[in-house]
């Protein structure tokens, strides 16, 4: 997702810096069929056509022993963005929705917020004023609502929120708004000897606790943005304490860096949906050999959302232009997917 796109008038990088500290979700919110491959054939929620065939051809080429393009299992690394690639990112990022709700939940203990910006704007849903507060305002919101506690304490807050929060349009838990075709793709790749990694601009601690249940991706195969934490003994007990200080933003040019630091191997397949995935796609597909780059293009306003170049969330501009030049596969969500969510 593009560091240059604007979210409430502030940069995507600023949002990620502010919200990288999110932690855990409950293990019970597994969408139906999230980790299965249909016995009747791979990718059952994908319509037959050029897009599906490109995926199958790539996998067949790199996994067929004797092929000149055969890739050993140890080198079969596939990386996936999260927001907009694996689950819904509109009308706003889930982590931003959490931050705004957190301000409202804490407001009774802070009566001064009703007259103090940017808290006043958050309480009133005044996005215009939130935008005018800029980077400093957003960081202030994040610092107050997300830091100054242990990881366990913050995890409990997030767990309680995710259990009751619902998407404003679909009225379902956010963890049910994962894309069934992408879940099938993850599972299919694993049956072919791939290791599947999440490489998200979102908070690494926000994704890791539930990624295995929802996506089949274990926590050690999640790469994301983070804040600094500090180990301390308090009252004779060890704890990791969250600090209001950025550690790493896994977005844009940071994604290849994060992949290299966490994985130690260059992917042979990368999947994204926005300009924030551009450098990951470039780094993957320009490494020589048979490689796959794929972009999820949101084109289905009826079943989900339709957006690309003109949006504050998940802007797809440079990467869409680069897809033709680099021969990346572009998924037309409306025409390539039989269904988007498991509950359809």
Regions picked out by a protein language model, each given a short descriptive name:
Residues 1-10, 18-26:
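N-terminal secretory signal peptides
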Residues 89-92, 97-100, 209-210, 283:
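Short, solvent-exposed loop/turn and secondary-structure capping segments
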Residues 92, 97-176, 180:
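A metal-dependent, Asp-based hydrolase signature
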Residues 19, 36-42, 46, 53-56, ...:
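C-terminal cap/substrate-recognition subdomain and adjoining C-terminal extension
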Residues 61-66:
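N-terminal post-signal-peptidase region of extra-cytosolic proteins
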Residues 68-72:
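Short loop/turn motifs at secondary-structure junctions and domain boundaries
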Residues 76-90, 281:
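Asp-based phosphoryl-transfer active-site loop
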Residues 28-35:
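Signal peptide processing junction and immediate N-terminal pro/mature segment
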